[in-house]
Amino acid sequence: MQAALIPDKNKFEYQSPEDMIRRIQTTVDSGSADEYFLYFHGVPHGYLFEIDREFSTSKLRYSVRFTTENSLGALICRILPGARHLALTYTLSMKIGLKIRAIPGHTYRSIDEFSGMRFDIRNIRSKEGHEAFVPATRSKRDAWPSMNAWPSMDAWPSMMLEVGYSEALDFLRLDAKWWLINSAGKTRFVIIVQLMTDPLAIHIECWAMVTSYHRQTIKAPTLIPTCVQLFDIDTEGTVTSASSELRIPYGCIFDEPNENAVDVVFTNAELTSFALPMFSLFSHDF
């Protein structure tokens, strides 16, 4: 569980939404790189709505993401690093979205993207992701492009993008496992992106469910969340990977077959083209 990765100094007994906001604001103001995750325990069941309401009046709501575990009365608050994080997330999600919509037979209506949307396993646990890709057949946004046409909370994403800093790789891997396991097969592909700062580099992993055959049992094979592709990009734009391309299978994006179906592919050259402007942006800060 993510809580095991959070230092004790960042764990607090829940008092009130106001107290939570004060602690988060203190962390934001400190700028400390090792304090992007805060753990609150003793959160009463059903209090998330009250917390949301209090956060809506502050400027912090768009800077945090929540993961809850109701059985433990626990809430993990992830504090987003700011403009650099947003630039990395937005740029990659935009490039992915453009490639998806360019698949023959698809348009801008075929896939919806949502930032910070909460997905919920009723009364058990919930999570807010960075960037969710939801097929239009799930989101049912009949009123598109009205921003009020929010999808059903049951419309889980088929694919997720999660982004973090050097300290967050273990958290990102747990994020990938969370989506793949808790979505009951609805989320089929997770891309995690880690911005490393010393030295400056970008690390990308693609996760999916993979069949596992346990040699010690005669039980049917099981599916386990697994990193299926891995890429490291340095400031020169050199991509190190066992793969020649980042491939997102069509069936991981859409639920329905298509005779024109093609996978979404980023060549290593395209990954370089994505990374170099990011490095130029980030180099002014490190």
Q: Language-model segments: which ranges?
A:
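Gly/Pro/Ser/Thr-rich low-complexity, intrinsically disordered segments predominantly at protein N-termini
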Residues: M1-F286
